[in-house]
Amino acid sequence: MRIFFITTDHLELRIWFRDDEDFRVGMNYLAVTAAVTGLKVIAFILMSNHVHILLACPNRVEALSFINHFKQLYGTYYCNRYGERRFFRRNGVDIQEIDPENEGLERVIAYIVMNSVAARICASANSYRWGSGSCYFNDYKETGRSLSSYSGRSRIALLKSKAMLPGNWTVGAGGYVLPESYVSVKGVETLFKSPLRYNFFLNNSSKAKRVKDLSGPAFRDQVISDGFKDLCITLFNKQDAFSLSVEEKAEAVRQLRWRFGADSHQISRVTSFPYSEINEMLSRLP
């Protein structure tokens, strides 16, 4: 079996997951995709503007089929909720085969689960809900309710899918299938051999090194997005960004920078204002 590392293009003007409900749906659709394709998920993480998935599968075609199935499911949901069509079809995907020799696999797993730490969303990989980081070497895993205990109608409502998943897969308190139901936890723990060695790779990953270079406060895209909506209403009495004048846009950008310490990339994602326009506005600030 070969190993493939899937990464979606990092979005600059949009975000995949606008709130916890979007993340919950994304988690369930990843479980559905794993069940439908029968492929083994080694590690994954859902970030606000991109997704990383590490798969064990026979070839690149099946890896591409996996991510396309996931994007199709989530894209349909996203369109129904937000009215944006063909958004995910245009979001590119990079697939790389990973050589398991010379600790290549360990480094990729560490890179994936440390994304949330590098983004300064959480202090440790095992405290981020929307990925597999909490699965490995964790003696306090969340317990939940087996899928077999749900009625057919309740299961479909929960998963937003009619796909049949194994009855022993578990749904946690957050309303999504827990990753340890379909992630190769034992395989990863065997690969790393011990929690000490696992933590060594986490602490020495490129993502961990990036954290050391960053300073200042950090907020999730979802928090800043909510803050931006509040600013539009309270400061300008406008319901959305599209109604703002040029001067109001500049003031909103200034407020996001001042209140949240957000950079140009993050402001562009949550407001959908062009990155170049954000940079120009910020350059005028004293």
Describe the residue ranges of each PLM region:
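Short Pro-Cys-Gly-centered "Cys-loop" motif that presents a nucleophilic cysteine in a tight turn
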Residues: M1-A43, C57-P286
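Short beta-strand->loop micro-motif that forms the acidic, two-metal-ion catalytic signature
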Residues: H50-P58
